[in-house]
A protein has these predicted regions:
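Extracytoplasmic/periplasmic, Sec-exported soluble proteins
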Residues: 67-74, 114-121, 125, 135, ...
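Short, aliphatic-rich beta-strand segments
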Residues: 101-106
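Bacterial N-terminal signal peptides that target proteins for export
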Residues: 2-15
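Periplasmic OmpA-like peptidoglycan-binding domain that tethers envelope proteins to the cell wall
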Residues: 147-230
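Bacterial N-terminal signal peptides
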Residues: 14-24
């Protein structure tokens, strides 16, 4: 039987160890690369355009821009403060792990039954939101109008679209009057009856499902100042 000399055995052993290390290196390097990429701070102003968000569906819009983990604490503190300021005037919830303020209005308070024009009382209910929208880089705004399941699918689609247009137009009038700036990003969604809060099996539940949602989503200035520790 052929045997290896001590020197040949050591050489082959070292070669095998080197090969294992070489094969393992790309995996370690790849893991380190993705770890660094995950921790990398991306300029939140990049890609923050109305055109980009208009092309997104509803849920991706609620999820973006993302907040870097270093900025999360500051963003959440600001979002909670906003919710505190609004809670005595409107119905407020915190979503996306306390990174987003959700304001909900029953559409019965904004519109007459089966009507699509905002009432005077409805515009008065929306007005307290405007002072918090003055800085267009602090928040992205998403509007979502929901219906119950009454009537045909076509009717529900048309109703939610018409009501959404009425709300959106009201915000555009606020732009024209100088109450908010033209470059504030407002993304509208007519949701029809696709996302009910409750089964449409009672009158109260149907009323609960008929709603306007207004989302305050962290904008690039809020994220950037939170990341840099510059929030007041």
């Amino acid at each position: 039987m052929k045997t290896l000399s001590t020197s040949n055995f050591a050489a082959r052993f070292l070669t095998a160890v080197a090969l294992v290390a070489l094969l393992a290196w790309p995996m370690d390097a790849e893991a380190q690369f993705f770890k660094k990429k995950e921790n990398r701070y991306t300029d939140p102003y990049k890609g923050f355009t109305e055109e980009a968000y208009m092309d997104m569906d509803f849920l991706p819009n609620i999820s973006t821009p993302e907040v870097h983990k270093k900025a999360k604490s500051g963003v959440k503190k600001t979002i909670r403060a906003l919710a505190e300021q609004l809670k005595n005037k409107v119905t407020v919830d915190l979503v996306r792990d306390d990174e987003v303020v959700l304001v909900t209005f029953p559409t019965d308070d904004l519109f007459l039954p089966n009507d699509t024009m905002l009432t005077t009382e409805g515009t008065a209910l929306l007005a307290p939101l405007l002072p918090h929208m003055k800085n267009p880089m602090m928040y992205k705004i998403v509007l979502a109008v929901h219906t119950d399941d009454t009537g045909s699918e076509l009717y529900r689609d048309e109703l939610s679209t018409a009501r959404l247009n009425s709300v959106y137009d009201w915000f555009m009038l606020a732009v024209e009057s100088g109450q908010i700036q033209e470059n504030l990003i407002i993304i509208p969604f007519a949701m029809s009856s696709t996302m009910p809060l409750a089964d449409n099996n009672t009158r109260d539940n149907r009323a609960l499902n008929r709603r306007l949602e207004v989302y305050f989503i962290p904008g690039p200035q809020l994220i950037d100042e939170a990341y840099k520790g510059q929030l007041k």
